[in-house]
Amino acid sequence: MAKHYIPNSAHKEEMLKEIGLSSIDELFADIPGKFIRDELNLPEGKSEYEVFLEMNEILGKNKTVLEMPTFLGAGTYFHYIPAHVKYLIERSEFLTAYTPYQPEISQGMLQALFEYQSLIAELVGLPVVNASMYDWGTAMAEAALMTVRLHRGKRKKFIVPRHTHPERLQVLETYAKGPGVEIETVKWNERGQVDIEDLKEKVKDAAGVYVEIPNFFGLLEEEVREIGEIAHEAGAYFVVGVDPTILGIVEAPGELGADIVVGEASYFGNPMNFGGPRAGIFAVRNDMKLIRQMPGRLIGMTKDAEGKRAFVMTLQTREQHIRRAKATSNICSNEALVAVAAAIHIASLGPRGIRELGEVILKNTAYLKKRLSEVAEIPFDGVNFKDVLVRFEKPYKEIHEELLKRNIHGGYYVGKHFPELGESALFAATETTRKEWVDALISALREVI
C-alpha cells in the first residue's frame, strides 16, 4: 500500500475543493497585494554554534547586581536565596508551574502548598491562606472585588491611599472597570502617610479600605490600627498589603485588625527574574462568609477512607474550573512552584531568622537614608524599610545616567507618577546591601549633583 508523506498536496487540493477554491492564492484574494510579501528578507542561516557565540556575546553585556551594585527597588528587590531552595524546587516532583488537576495523586505538592499556607498564616496573623495568587497587585485587586461581593453589590467603593504602588493601582483599576467598582484615593499628609482626616471624609459607603506596610515611599504607616478602626466603624472591610520580610519586626496585620491580608510571597526563595514570576499572598479571618468568597485554591488536610492523613483541594465550588460564571476568581492557573520556593526559604529561616532578616534590612535602610540625607533632601520623616524617597534639584534622569557611567544603578524615578514630588527617586536597600556600595553611591552623587 502506498504511503503518503509530507508534503501531501492531495490533502491540500481536497480542502480547497471542499471550500470551492482552486488555489491557495484565491484563499487570500481579499487581501490587498501590497500587504502580501513574496519573500522575507532574512539573512543566511547560521549553525547552532554560530548562534551560540552570537547570543553569548549579547548576553555578556548584561551585568548582575554583584557586578553593578543596584539601589533600584520599588517592588522588586535583590534578596539572598539559600542554595538548597533552588535545588529542592528543581526536583522533578515539584518542577511544574501548573495546578495538579488530579490533586490527590500529588500528595507531595499538596503538602508543600499546605505548609506554605501554614507558614504565611503564622506570619500575617490570619488563619486562612490560599495557595497563592499571581502577585501582590492581583491579590490586592481580588481583595477589592471580594469586599464588594461581601456587601452583595450594595457598596461599590474601594478606598486606597494615593501613595499606593502605582503599578499595583493600575492593576486594581483594570480589575475594577468591568464590575464597576469605584476606586477612591486618600491623600498623604506632611509625613508621607495616610491622611486620617481625608479618610474619615471619604470612608462612608466604602466596601473596603486598603493600606500598605510599608507604603510606596518606604515608610511604615504609624496609624494602621486606627485606619482599621475607621474602616470597621463605617462598615467597611479592612485590607492590608504587606511586604512579608518585615513581619519579624512589626506586629502582624491580623493583630492590627485586618480582615484580609495581601502581599508578595516571592520576596522569599525567588530571584528578581526581571520582575516575575511572582506569588501573591491572600489571607482572611476565620469566617466562613469571607472564606467562601476568597479567590484562589485552598489546600486542606483531612483523612482518607483508611483513616490516614491526606491533603486535598477544598471548597472547590468557589473556583472557575467548577463554576466558571459564578467563580470567586477567574485566575485559571497559579504560582505553585514560586509558593513552594517561598515556603522552603521561610522554613529554613525560622522565627529567629525572619526576625534577623528584618532587623538587618531595617539597619541597612537606615544607613542608606542617613548617607543620602547628606547629599539630597529626604521629603518625609519616619521609619523606612527597604525604600527611601530622595528629592534632587537636578533632573533625576541626568543623575541616573551619570551613575550608570560609574557602574552604579540608581533608584526608581518617582516624579513620573507624582509630579508634585519633583525630581524624586526611591533608593532601596536589603540584607544584601553592603556598606561600601552605599559609600560608593554617595561619592558618585557628590560628583554628579
Swiss-Prot record:
<dbReference type="InterPro" id="IPR015421">
    <property type="entry name" value="PyrdxlP-dep_Trfase_major"/>
</dbReference>
<dbReference type="InterPro" id="IPR015422">
    <property type="entry name" value="PyrdxlP-dep_Trfase_small"/>
</dbReference>
<dbReference type="InterPro" id="IPR049315">
    <property type="entry name" value="GDC-P_N"/>
</dbReference>
<dbReference type="InterPro" id="IPR023010">
    <property type="entry name" value="GcvPA"/>
</dbReference>
<dbReference type="InterPro" id="IPR020581">
    <property type="entry name" value="GDC_P"/>
</dbReference>
<dbReference type="Pfam" id="PF02347">
    <property type="entry name" value="GDC-P"/>
</dbReference>
<dbReference type="GO" id="GO:0004375">
    <property type="term" value="F:glycine dehydrogenase (decarboxylating) activity"/>
</dbReference>
<dbReference type="InterPro" id="IPR015424">
    <property type="entry name" value="PyrdxlP-dep_Trfase"/>
</dbReference>
<dbReference type="GO" id="GO:0019464">
    <property type="term" value="P:glycine decarboxylation via glycine cleavage system"/>
</dbReference>
<comment type="subunit">
    <text>The glycine cleavage system is composed of four proteins: P, T, L and H. In this organism, the P 'protein' is a heterodimer of two subunits.</text>
</comment>
<protein>
    <recommendedName>
        <fullName>Probable glycine dehydrogenase (decarboxylating) subunit 1</fullName>
        <ecNumber>1.4.4.2</ecNumber>
    </recommendedName>
</protein>
<comment type="similarity">
    <text>Belongs to the GcvP family. N-terminal subunit subfamily.</text>
</comment>
<dbReference type="GO" id="GO:0009116">
    <property type="term" value="P:nucleoside metabolic process"/>
</dbReference>
<keyword id="KW-0560">Oxidoreductase</keyword>
<comment type="function">
    <text>The glycine cleavage system catalyzes the degradation of glycine. The P protein binds the alpha-amino group of glycine through its pyridoxal phosphate cofactor; CO(2) is released and the remaining methylamine moiety is then transferred to the lipoamide cofactor of the H protein.</text>
</comment>
